[in-house]
A protein has these predicted regions:
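Carboxylate-rich, polar loop motifs that coordinate divalent cations or form catalytic acidic clusters
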Residues: 1-239
């Protein structure tokens, strides 16, 4: 986690011990948005449009790549097929090689003639990258660089419930949970092109804005909302 301009790391087995990695002044300068992303291989720390890799043995931050303009904000980072994908809030998606050199750039969908805000990345079991944006769900095939934008369509029952996608979470049954801003919770299964909706109801989902998910060891789904607190879905009893 990031706290007081430091990255802090701890293990539940070794509490209350906390390891701190102080950020250099250029990373924590006023006005720069800080983002922390942990992959299987690296710990990434973003400051504005600058992306650093943290060496956990030495505590040093090494500049990996710089993307976007002066007001750029990095939202998420993903490693796929030897490439590193860097998602920004408003400046698009960048593909870098293992050394941080930018190779390809993918523009985000437009909303009201401006680039739509982006939220996060997800890599599915078929190798497709899902990009959550506030103007739809962008699907990217890394090998061919082809993209497809999924948007809400009132005339098509299996479309997204809302174009503003805030969160994506894989389900162990093979589907994908998609949280939207005010447009219900969606469960997508591309095997049968199905989309199930879960709207805010008494005794069910208590708020339509879903911002994050997490799954516990028993397979139950914890659903974080913007204004409705934390929801819990009992998978075994389907409630």
């Amino acid at each position: 986690l990031i706290r007081n301009n430091d990255i802090e790391s701890f293990s539940p087995e070794r509490l209350p011990a906390v390891t701190r990695f102080p950020m250099p002044p250029e990373m924590s300068a006023p006005g720069r948005t800080l983002t922390l992303v942990c992959t299987k291989e690296y710990v990434y720390a973003a400051s504005g449009g600058d992306l650093y890799r943290l060496n956990r043995e030495t505590g040093q931050y090494v500049l990996f790549a710089s993307v976007g303009g002066g007001s750029c904000v990095i939202r998420d980072v993903m490693e796929c097929n030897g490439s590193v994908y860097v998602l920004t809030l408003m400046d698009g998606l960048y593909e870098c090689d293992g050394n941080g050199r930018i190779g390809r750039y993918f523009r985000l969908p437009l909303e009201y003639e401006k680039s739509a805000g982006a939220k996060e990345l997800h890599l599915d079991s078929q190798g497709i990258i899902w990009v959550a944006t506030q103007s739809g769900l962008l699907l990217l095939e890394p090998l061919t660089a082809s993209t497809q934008l999924l948007r809400s369509d009132l005339h098509y029952p299996y479309s997204l419930p809302n174009n503003s996608v805030w969160s994506i979470f894989p389900d162990p049954d093979g589907g994908i949970w998609v949280g939207t801003y005010g447009g219900k919770l969606a469960y997508m299964t591309f095997a049968d092109n199905g989309v199930d909706y879960f709207k805010a109801t008494p005794g069910g989902l208590n708020h339509p804005i879903v911002s994050c998910f997490e799954e516990d060891d028993a397979g139950n789904l914890w659903i974080g909302t913007e204004g409705g607190g934390l929801n819990y879905w009992d998978r075994k009893n389907d409630r």
